[in-house]
Amino acid sequence: MNKLKLHGFNNLTKSLGFCIYDICYAQTFADRDGYIAYIDDEYNADRLTEILRETCSIIGANILNIARQDYNPQGASVTILISEEAIDPRDVDTSEHPGPLPDSIVAHLDKSHICVHTYPESHPTEGLCTFRADIEVSTCGIISPLNALNYLIHQLESDIVTIDYRVRGFTRDVNGVKHYIDHQINSIQNFMCKDIQSLYHMMDVNVYQENIFHTKMMLKDFDLKHYLFNSHPEQLSVQEKDLITKRLYKEMQEIYYGRNVVEV
């Protein structure tokens, strides 16, 4: 696609959203609580902030503000407000006066921001534990959130990933013609490196006429030892290993396809 000469600012909004799932099996209630405590500490607000800072660097965005919070009993959130151009310190108002109303903050946040929220949870009786990180990178202008795709997948090593990318609005060229997208894309997969593609089964559901792209990913290889928390396959009987494997596989299939599997 040839470069466009625009009339004014690039008004397209590009949003990249991830749901990243980590799944494990904990044999006892104590192990389940231990997994949730471990994952909650592993992905606390401080670490998530560093991941998002690096994401900003990768996509070439400038950080305006960071808000972060760890929650009790578990979970964390980080939101970073970003801009396309560096901020001149002379433009920062440090005078003593009331700040902006919430409506104006939300309006700005909808333009360019990066946010992540975490959701640890567990099955009440079957030992299944899942951790979900929900990430959104939303930009306006020439910044592309797709540049951070490989970095985020590598940083948050996951069993299942669902990715949404959409382009909204339009921008106008110097001749007054509206353009609803400013780059070529037919699949999110085309922006992934080969090593990621080799690790995952992937499926696309795209709505090209609406500039909406969706990719689901699930790890190809299954090794039970990677899914056991605080235990090892050698400690389990053949029957126990088969039961746990079936439970994990069913859980992963349900999350991947977004529907519950009814056993007949």
From Swiss-Prot:
GO terms for cellular component: cytosol. Belongs to the prokaryotic AdoMetDC family. Type 2 subfamily. Heterooctamer of four alpha and four beta chains arranged as a tetramer of alpha/beta heterodimers. It holds the Pfam family AdoMet_dc. Is synthesized initially as an inactive proenzyme. Formation of the active enzyme involves a self-maturation process in which the active site pyruvoyl group is generated from an internal serine residue via an autocatalytic post-translational modification. Two non-identical subunits are generated from the proenzyme in this reaction, and the pyruvate is formed at the N-terminus of the alpha chain, which is derived from the carboxyl end of the proenzyme. Its cofactor is pyruvate. HAMAP family: AdoMetDC_2 (MF_00465). It comes from Hamiltonella defensa subsp. Acyrthosiphon pisum (strain 5AT). This is S-adenosylmethionine decarboxylase proenzyme. GO terms for molecular function: adenosylmethionine decarboxylase activity. Catalyzes the decarboxylation of S-adenosylmethionine to S-adenosylmethioninamine (dcAdoMet), the propylamine donor required for the synthesis of the polyamines spermine and spermidine from the diamine putrescine.
